[in-house]
Amino acid sequence: MARVKRAMNARKRHKKVLKLAKGYYGGKSKLFKTANESVIRALRNAYVGRKLKKRDYRKLWIARINAATRMNGLSYSKFMNGIKNAGIDINRKMLSEIAINDPKAFAELVDVAKKQLNA
């Protein structure tokens, strides 16, 4: 069986990992093994972070909507139920923006939800 020399492939792989580890402290930016571990961990954390960011923003929007609806005398869950029954299809991101930037329009939405709940 012929001998396999991996010089160029290994060099390319090492350079790629060390390039990703640029800016890390100490051996994590200089030594391949520790740099590789750090890069793998960093990429995994970045992936998880992108998923968590979506959850965090949704939580933030819900908290903002809840605060605004309680100022208008309704709870978040009742408001969402009333608005859904009224056939108003606005996502939570837009509702939170309306609650912050246009309180009068949001108060009208709360009134629509209240009427729908009473009907």
Curated annotation (Swiss-Prot):
Keyword entries, A-Z: Ribonucleoprotein, Ribosomal protein, RNA-binding, rRNA-binding
SUPFAM superfamilies in UniProt: Ribosomal protein L20
One Pfam family in the UniProt entry: Ribosomal_L20
Single GO BP term: translation
GO cellular component: ribonucleoprotein complex; ribosome
Signal peptide: none
PROSITE patterns in UniProt: RIBOSOMAL_L20 (PS00937)
GO molecular-function term, one example from the UniProt record: rRNA binding
CDD domains for the chain: Ribosomal_L20
Annotated NCBIfam families: rplT_bact (TIGR01032)
Known role: Binds directly to 23S ribosomal RNA and is necessary for the in vitro assembly process of the 50S ribosomal subunit. It is not involved in the protein synthesizing functions of that subunit.
Family (UniProt): Belongs to the bacterial ribosomal protein bL20 family.
Record HAMAP family: Ribosomal_bL20
Name of the protein this chain belongs to: Large ribosomal subunit protein bL20
Native species: Clostridium botulinum (strain ATCC 19397 / Type A)
Organism lineage string: Bacteria, Bacillati, Bacillota, Clostridia, Eubacteriales
